[in-house]
Amino acid sequence: MVFFRSVSLLNKLRSRAVQQSNLSNTVRWFQVQTSASDLDLRSQLKELIPEQQERIKKLKAEHGKVQLGNITVDMVLGGMRGMTGLLWETSLLDPEEGIRFRGLSIPECQKLLPGAKPGGEPLPEGLLWLLLTGKVPTKEQVDALSAELRSRAAVPEHVYKTIDALPVTAHPMTQFATGVMALQVQSEFQKAYEKGIHKTKYWEPTYEDSITLIAQLPVVAAYIYRRMYKNGQSISTDDSLDYGANFAHMLGYDSPSMQELMRLYVTIHTDHEGGNVSAHTGHLVASALSDPYLSFAAALNGLAGPLHGLANQEVLLWIKSVVSECGENVTKEQLKDYIWKTLNSGKVVPGYGHGVLRNTDPRYICQREFALKHLPDDPLFQLVSNLFEVVPPILTELGKVKNPWPNVDAHSGVLLNHYGLTEARYYTVLFGVSRAIGICSQLVWDRALGLPLERPKSVTMEWLENHCKKSS
């Protein structure tokens, strides 16, 4: 890589920001691109992979027997919470600070990743580049990747016919997972595997499948939305738009603010390390050498669960139930009464608490900042703001919640609702489009690093009881 003296001030500032952010060597910054290969994501990966392959070999050889912690009965019975057991390169979740994408926090991503003009929200294509390479991309690299995604976005006709075979009333996630399965006939990995590709090259068709899948998902998702809620009148892609803006356009929303929201939404929902249901499912299924289409379809079925991806639709429905019962001008005292009513009925306040986080989710904070900028007078946003003040003290008083603070789901539905995307039942599909970027990025590295079939040991309650007796 050749570095020129005439680098732009922006590149200097970005480089300096990375150096000063006290990060690990995970994130790299290249100031100037000098050849066509620098704009090609696959070429960049091809250069990076050998180094990381040597790194994992060294880690296994020198530290393979190092213990990472003790496994307790609580962990086994409690959904493996707190159990370190997965390698996930693309992101790491800190209980206090929240998610870091390749070492960068969300505020750092907003500052460093190339953004759309004039709004400034990071382009999702930039985060895809970051997750795959560990490098903050230039605007030229992001533009090249955006063009590549557009070139792969055409969806085969049979996919639409497969979706149309389902009742239009089928849940959007059912239709979405079905559409992804129909896309699977394109799989380059399956074809290469059947031809006997060497395992050291598994990552290459995995990359091709992953990029194509990411490119086509917004088209499939938008088709489902228009089929269900807009009389089947689909909207074609616009080759002048970036990934997030094009998705908003195909859904039928062309305002600059909605395009900005979609860029933000897709970016912050991409990845949340590897232990959540959808990410873990995708990784698990892919460990059997199932291709990215099969693996991501499985991940979507996990995402569709009420305890995972459906939470964002439940938040908006709950907020609307507050308005329905208490009126639009609900006071904080009324809110307190309604929250206690919810809790005393054995339910939870949706959008609050998190399995890992012990502070306010930074994904909530950046959505709140977006709302303060674009829709400060929206009644539902004002209600969400009041909930932010009222709910945590009540949950703290209750004493049973480790994290009383809002998570990402507490805010997203209100933003979407403001711009007219009011169909809460559909919201998890948006989540799925975004999450593909993180899951598929890691799948490429799973194959590049030669990660094995996942096969943890299971035990019975009798085994646990006997083991505990011996240990006492």
UniProtKB/Swiss-Prot annotation:
Known EC number: 2.3.3.16
Catalytic residue list: H308, H354, D409
GO BP: carbohydrate metabolic process; citrate metabolic process; tricarboxylic acid cycle
Alphabetized GO MF terms: citrate (Si)-synthase activity
Listed SUPFAM superfamilies: Citrate synthase
Top enzyme class: transferase
Family: Belongs to the citrate synthase family.
Additional facts recorded: Citrate synthase is found in nearly all cells capable of oxidative metabolism.
Protein name: Citrate synthase, mitochondrial
